[in-house]
Every structure is written in structure tokens, then in C-alpha cells.
Regions:
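Alpha-helical assembly-interface signal, strongest on the long, hydrophobic N-terminal helix that forms
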Residues: 1-84
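Long, compositionally biased low-complexity segments
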Residues: 70-436
Length: 436
């Protein structure tokens, strides 16, 4: 009888089982790696975008507080203007009452208006002075909040990146390159905007002056009593200005201008009719234009200077943040770079899912199955461009500034230089760094 061979099928089964287990392990490992890489990339995107959202909010907060302070300064200018104009009216109405004393009905109306305005001015002056002091105090509180927000952002943004990663997955953390990138970002953030204080407050003073209404900035008119002639005329001049950054000053003058001769000679100030002035803040020897009052009505202006009603409630124009000089020339908002890492030992791969990391061989030993990378990386970048939600109605392009709250958070692509720099710090292969 022929002899039967036994045991050969067991060898084939061992080889087949090892091949099947290896295929299962590597399939599971590949799927796990893809999922983990995607989660790592999503975590990096979420951290970068969350940090950029805070950066945009900080810039918009700067813009809103700047606009609030400008609005308060305009309100202060209106208050000082009203006090100056009211003081001017208290001197104008008695003279007007004398001129109209011979006119029936008008004389009694003018006398009543004179007495009424005297009481109005008596209540108006102290009330507006109190309002000016309160408004100035509020403006400086707003400026202090702006400084806290702006400087605090340098510490908040890195904390947001780390917190976002921890909330996504406690295993994720910033790599060494990612930590270095946050330090670079903090430096760029502090250079992006400059703190305009002291004599550099001319920027916000210019914005404030251009934001004033017509009554505050220039109160002038010319009245010719003798229509059709140029023999005499009344010249009203006045205006309110921020003098030396720490003093709001208003002046109002009215003078009679006439020719030196009856028909010849230039029209010049002959008689001051009414004048008034008001200021709030530190006393200053400087003076403004005040609607060309000093040139057109010099005598009345000197009288107004001596009659200025002063208030020390104004604390000065607050120091504010705005784009630095370098950023105004070449606009480049700070870029938030995030590079996340995960140790392969902490990854939930085929070993954790299947419970084994080796397969049997014909020699009776175990062949270990291991992943390809000891560490995993993912990077992302975000920034805050200046974008209006809708185009301007006049078609003009608005330049970036910290007076307009149009800062938006957006994810952007990393440049090759950024990828190489991060990979170099982390010790990763440079040939992989340039791959998107």
C-alpha cells in the first residue's frame, strides 16, 4: 500500500494565516493612519482658526474703541462750542436789545430773550463742564480697556491654540516648531500696531478734527446790513479746536467792519460787538485758527481770550493703537502658524485595535509589525485680512486701519519657507516639508 504524507497542510496553513494576519494588520494600520492624520490636520485647522478669530476680535475691538473715543471727542468739541457760543450770546443780546429798544413789540421780545438766555447760560455752563469731565473720564477708561485687550492678546492667542488642541484630543500638542511659531507671532503682533501717545497723537487728533460737525469746526458768516453796498458789514467768526492735544478751546467773535473812508479804503474791524470763549483741559499758550477769528476779528479775539470760561475736566486726548508705520506701507497682518504633533506610541493603530503586533513564521518565531513614523505632524495657518462686508457706495477702496472694524479670520496656505522652517526646528525630513 502507498504511504501517505502527513503534516504538509499545517505548514501551508501557517504561511497562509501569517499572510492573512499581516494583510489585516496593515489594512487596519493604513486606515487608522489616514483617520489619525485627518484628525490631526482638522485639529491644527481648528486651533489656527480659533486663534485667528480672537486676533480679528482684538483688532475689531481696537477699531470700535477708537471710534468710540473719536465720538466722545466730537461730543466734547460740541459741548465746548456750545459754551463758547452761549457766552457770546450773553454779550450779543444786551446790545441787540439796545438797538431794538425803539421798535414796538420787538423791544419787549428782545428783553425777554435777554433775561431768558442769561438764566439758560447760568445753568448751561456748569452742566456742560460736568459733562465734559465725565465724557473725558469715560474715554480714558475705554483707552485703558483697549490697552489691556491689545497687550493681553499676545498671551491669549497661544493659550487658545493649546486649549483648542487639548479640547480636540488630549494626545495632541504643539511641536517644538509650533511653540517657536507662537513666539514669532507674539513679536509680529506687538509690531503690527503702534501705540500713539504723547506728540504722536497727531494721528488721532487729525481724525477727530475731520469728524467734527460744521457748528463745532467753523462758525462763521458775513452780514451786510446795507444791502447792495459794501460800506459796512458784520463779520462773525468762530470755531473749536483741540490745542496741544490736551485742551479743547472754542472762540466766537462778532465785529463791525467798515472802511477807513466813506467810499475808499479796505473793510477792517472797527468795533467788537460780541465775543465769548470756552476751554476744557490744561491751560495752553498755543492758539488755533478758530474760524479765522484772530485774523478777521483781532480786537474781538483778544477780548474773547480774556473772557474764556475754563474747565479743567478734560484729561487730554487719549493715546490709542493704530497700524504701525511699517504696516501702513506694506500691509501684512500677523500669520498664526500651528504645527501639531502626535507620538506614534500614543496613536490608536492596528496594535491597539487588533490586539497584536506580530505574526508567526515557519521558523516558529514572531515577525513584528511596526508603523513607519515615530511622530506624526500636521500644520495649518490663519490670518486676519481687512475686508469690508460690502463695497463702498462711492467705489473707493478703503485702506486698512484700526478705525474700521472690518477684520476677518481666514485659513490660508503655508508657504514653502514656513514649512521648511517648522520642519527644520522639529527635525523632520525637509523633502516632506515642501509638500502641501
Amino acid at each position: 500500500m502507498p504511504q501517505r504524507q502527513q503534516g504538509q497542510s499545517l505548514l501551508v496553513l501557517v504561511v497562509l494565516l501569517g499572510a492573512l494576519l499581516s494583510a489585516l494588520w496593515w489594512t487596519t494600520e493604513a486606515g487608522s493612519a489616514v483617520n489619525e492624520k485627518q484628525r490631526l490636520a482638522n485639529a491644527a485647522d481648528a486651533a489656527a482658526l480659533s486663534a485667528a478669530v480672537w486676533q480679528a476680535r482684538a483688532l475689531n475691538f481696537d477699531a470700535y474703541t477708537n471710534r468710540a473715543i473719536v465720538a466722545n471727542e466730537a461730543a466734547l468739541a460740541q459741548s465746548v462750542s456750545l459754551r463758547s457760543w452761549s457766552s457770546h450770546m450773553t454779550r450779543l443780546l444786551p446790545g441787540a436789545a439796545l438797538v431794538t429798544a425803539w421798535v414796538p413789540y420787538l423791544n419787549s421780545a428782545m428783553m425777554t430773550l435777554q433775561r431768558l438766555w442769561h438764566h439758560i447760560d447760568a445753568a448751561l455752563q456748569p452742566s456742560l463742564m460736568t459733562l465734559e469731565a465725565t465724557t473725558s473720564l469715560v474715554s480714558h477708561d475705554i483707552a485703558a480697556a483697549q490697552r489691556v485687550m491689545h497687550l493681553g492678546t499676545a498671551a491669549v492667542v497661544p493659550a487658545i491654540v493649546r486649549e483648542s488642541l487639548a479640547e480636540t484630543d488630549p494626545r495632541y500638542r504643539l511641536s517644538t516648531g509650533g511653540e517657536a511659531a507662537t513666539a514669532v507671532w507674539a513679536t509680529e503682533w506687538l509690531r503690527f500696531a503702534s501705540f500713539y501717545g504723547g506728540s504722536f497723537r497727531w494721528r488721532q487728533r487729525d481724525v477727530v478734527h475731520r469728524s467734527l460737525d460744521g457748528f463745532s469746526s467753523d462758525r462763521r458768516y458775513t452780514l451786510s446790513p446795507l444791502l447792495g453796498t459794501s460800506l459796512v458789514r458784520f463779520e462773525k467768526r468762530g470755531g473749536t479746536e483741540l490745542v496741544d492735544f490736551d485742551n479743547w478751546r472754542g472762540l466766537d467773535t462778532l465785529s463791525l467792519h467798515a472802511r477807513r473812508g466813506i467810499l475808499f479804503g479796505s473793510l477792517r474791524e472797527r468795533t467788537p460787538v460780541a465775543w465769548g470763549g470756552a476751554e476744557s483741559g490744561q491751560a495752553s499758550l498755543s492758539r488755533g485758527e478758530h474760524g479765522d477769528s484772530y485774523r478777521r476779528n483781532p480786537r474781538a479775539s483778544r477780548l474773547a481770550d480774556r473772557a474764556v470760561r475754563r474747565s479743567a475736566g478734560y484729561l487730554g486726548l487719549p493715546s490709542l493703537y493704530d497700524l504701525s508705520a511699517a504696516q501702513r506701507e506694506r500691509f501684512a497682518p500677523p500669520r498664526i502658524l500651528v504645527r501639531v504633533t502626535l507620538d506614534d506610541s500614543a496613536r490608536r493603530g492596528a496594535k491597539a485595535l487588533l490586539g497584536f503586533a506580530s505574526v508567526p513564521t515557519l521558523a516558529g518565531s514572531e515577525q513584528r509589525l511596526e508603523g513607519s513614523a515615530p511622530r506624526w505632524f500636521a500644520e495649518s495657518a490663519a490670518t486676519t485680512p481687512f475686508e469690508r462686508p460690502h463695497p463702498r457706495s462711492d467705489g473707493a477702496q478703503e485702506l486698512p486701519s484700526l478705525f474700521s472694524p472690518f477684520w476677518r479670520a481666514r485659513l490660508v496656505n503655508l508657504t514653502s519657507d514656513e514649512r521648511i522652517r517648522l520642519a527644520t526646528i522639529d527635525g523632520a525630513p525637509l523633502w516632506l516639508a515642501v509638500a502641501p
